[in-house]
């Protein structure tokens, strides 16, 4: 069983502990209504139905999650789904004691390199797994990463913005605007893997610095020069990667190796 580093448990009350809010269920199960509004999309607009081999149809989010979740620990497991008269119900695993990464970071201010390295590696493995299955998550951010506080296992959740991975450019954006790549901001298109690499760089910055690099009025662009804390080890992999990402036009060269 995986165990987290010393200090894995956050102090005091677990803000953001994953009870799934109104979605809570018993034991290790969590449930989610797909009709709940998200990302400013109305309930009915947010559900894309795909035809299935048996002649029925299924929501895209469920199809994508079914492709990537079975047997892989780094993605939340879809256990069952049901179509109700006015809702679609998803039943997923829910670690008994867990917290999303946003609140996991907030409880500490920032993550020590050892903890950040372990969690970031797990997220990378989950992203690699998804892309190998032909799935693009499109909304990688701390809120969509669940940390099992008992084992230290990170799980990628919420495929509501996901789609199939393609070699051609995407001309419709789905996800969180503050994680969108510069090419979308400047040109209105983006490619799946480079956009994922960009959001992973932002995620890593949040983990080791405790804040979003573009939340202080900085415009999302290639010409981003961000100051990094001196506590980051000069020889460490995270420090090298983040320093390359935080200087103009170097992030592709350094982060594309993640794939």
Language model features with spans:
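Conserved end of the kinase activation segment
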Residues: 184-194
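Conserved C-terminal C-lobe helix
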Residues: 231-245
């Amino acid at each position: 069983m995986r165990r987290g580093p010393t200090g894995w448990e956050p102090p005091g009350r677990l803000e953001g502990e994953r009870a799934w809010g109104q979605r809570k269920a018993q034991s290790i199960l969590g449930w989610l209504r797909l009709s709940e509004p998200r990302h400013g999309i109305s309930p009915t607009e947010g559900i894309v139905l795909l035809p299935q081999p048996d002649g029925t149809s299924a929501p895209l989010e469920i199809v994508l999650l079914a492709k990537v979740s079975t047997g892989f620990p780094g993605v939340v497991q879809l256990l069952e789904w049901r179509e109700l008269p006015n809702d679609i119900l998803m039943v997923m695993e829910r670690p008994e004691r867990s917290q999303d990464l946003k609140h996991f970071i907030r409880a500490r201010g920032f993550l020590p390199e050892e903890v950040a390295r372990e969690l970031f590696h797990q997220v990378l493995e989950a992203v690699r797994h998804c892309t190998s299955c032909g799935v693009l998550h499109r909304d990688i951010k701390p809120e969509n990463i669940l940390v099992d506080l008992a084992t230290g296992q990170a799980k990628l959740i919420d495929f509501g913005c996901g789609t199939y991975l393609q070699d051609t450019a995407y001309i419709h954006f789905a996800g969180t605007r503050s994680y969108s790549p510069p090419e979308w901001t400047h040109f209105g298109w983006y490619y799946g893997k480079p956009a994922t690499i960009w959001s992973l760089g932002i995620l890593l910055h949040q983990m080791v610095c405790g804040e979003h690099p573009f939340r202080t009025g900085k415009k999302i662009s290639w010409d981003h020069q961000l100051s990094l804390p001196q506590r980051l080890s000069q020889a460490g992999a995270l420090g090298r990667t983040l320093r390359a990402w935080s200087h103009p036009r170097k992030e592709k060269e350094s982060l594309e190796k993640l794939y």
